[in-house]
Amino acid sequence: ILYIADAGRFVFMGRMLDVWQQKELKTIDEIERATQRVFLDTMGYDKTTYAGYKLGHGPRRTVLFVDPHCGWCHKLISEVKSDPELLKDYTFIFHVVPVLGEASHTYAKKLWCSVGTDEEKLQAMLEGDEAMNALPAMTSCPMDDQDHTVMLSKIIGVRGVPFVIAPDGRVSQGKPADIKAFLRGEEPKQAKAAAKPQK
């Protein structure tokens, strides 16, 4: 790899390694592809070590990071839940992370520490704070998986939600205008996202 600074004075030469993919990047195309994708499998991603909620039973996995109070996240979850074709073709793993403030942190923990199926918890999130508060709480709730989820979101650069990782590693930072088209790899339209409020 050869990198020349704008003014042409400095030249960097050497190897570039992608730790996530565990491989050397040798071409511009490989570098471009690596910077636009998140390869969860080579990062050692295992759904069972993170706080996640599953919808669907298809062979292709899609991972999404959402916030309890994110309107675009709610719209995306509703679209997925109501589409039998999506649920047949994909398995969706929703990771709830507190991107939008302290209240989101409280409700992300409340969802994780509640009793119910994944679908029931996601439905409560869609219905709002009252429904989430009504979920029965576990008697004991280790937070390791939720903490790992927040750490993973920071490692891969989740700054706004929803953050969608397609089965082939492509990323949508925001709600895809057409989730089916995005998952098929078609050219995306403008995505919609909720970002953390500026302090």
Residue positions per predicted region:
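Structural alpha/beta surface segment adjacent to cysteine/selenocysteine redox centers
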Residues: 59-142, 154-159, 184, 193-197
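A broad, low-specificity signal for short, low-complexity segments enriched in glycine/proline
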Residues: 22-27, 52-56, 122-127
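Short coil/turn linker and secondary-structure boundary residues
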Residues: 23-26, 116-117, 144, 174-177
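A short beta-strand-turn-helix
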Residues: 40-61, 82
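Glycine-rich loops and low-complexity Gly/Arg-rich segments
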Residues: 19-20, 27-30, 37-39, 87-91, ...
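N-terminal targeting signals for export/organelle localization
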Residues: 1-41, 196-199
